[in-house]
Amino acid sequence: SNHTTIMWKLNWTELGIDLDRLKEVLTYDAAQPMIFSSGFFLLLFLEFSLVYLLLQKRTTARLLFVTLFSYYFYYKSSGTYFFLLGIVTVSDFLLARRMEMTVEHWKRKMLVVCSLCINLGLLCYFKYTNFFYEMLAPLWNGRFEPLDIFLPVGISFFTFQSLSYTIDVYRRDLKPLSSLLDYAFYVSFFPQLVAGPIVRARDFIPQIRRPLSVTSEMFGQGIFFIVSGLFKKAVISDYISVNFVERIFDNPGLYSGLENLFGIYGYALQIYCDFSGYSDMAIGLALLLGFHFPPNFDSPYKADSVTDFWHRWHISLSTWLRDYLYISLGGNRKGKIRTYINLILTMLLGGL
């Protein structure tokens, strides 16, 4: 009996399986969340690409595989908060389906308001509960102890993406999807999941079931975007941050006024290279998988006015706010005062 038990016991080492390494790959590590610029992700993407190519002709299987990988990617980035992706996906999918079957305008409006409440409610809870609590604490007991609320990575991006879908369906600009898998694929698609760009439903959904085709031009552009994005993020941004900006910002009194000024300019360059580097990598990864994303930055520091800068920085967000918020509020069509109020509200919500 003992002999049989020993025979059935798997010797993982003999099988060449490193359990510690397996645990590291499969579990979330808050100290080392998965990011595009990590060697681990790049190796994982190569393995992912092989399976992706094998499923080239099997569209549904490929969509399922990518969706599962996207959820795994988000789990490795934010831990158990990947369930929020599921909540947003299922609720907005069902609300949009219901909207399509509803004739009465007020009922359709209630459904889109419901979608807004779910998405913006989640966003405000995770981003602003502590902010408002800190402001109101003096009114209660004078002491502020921050609540233990973790900010899930990329929550702004996937909530805004999902809202673009329900709002477009409400406006009858888009027919709702009949497949939950297709919608889950759209919301969770890993290249833009954690740092954008915000890809609108009307631009992305028509690409989902198209035959997979990656031309040599797309492949070349994809590699270029990934390499340039990696250079911006891992070389320029990280180097400036560690060796320059953090030293000055941590002890500004030790440095001259001119050095502090250089620190401010260095920080401006750091955040641009960090953010646009991620966007470039996302655009490049999507191209390698056969998908097109909109550009997110257009040399913003070459802008000659604040308005021009707004048009060049985080373009997918500024155009989203313009089309779904500013124009919905009335834009500049209702007099000067109303225009200023609309602009302030748009900027305020843009800060989310």
Residue spans for each PLM region:
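Membrane-embedded transmembrane alpha-helical bundles that form the catalytic cores
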Residues: 8-352
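Short, Lys/Arg-enriched N-terminal segments with co-localized hydrophobic residues
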Residues: 1-6
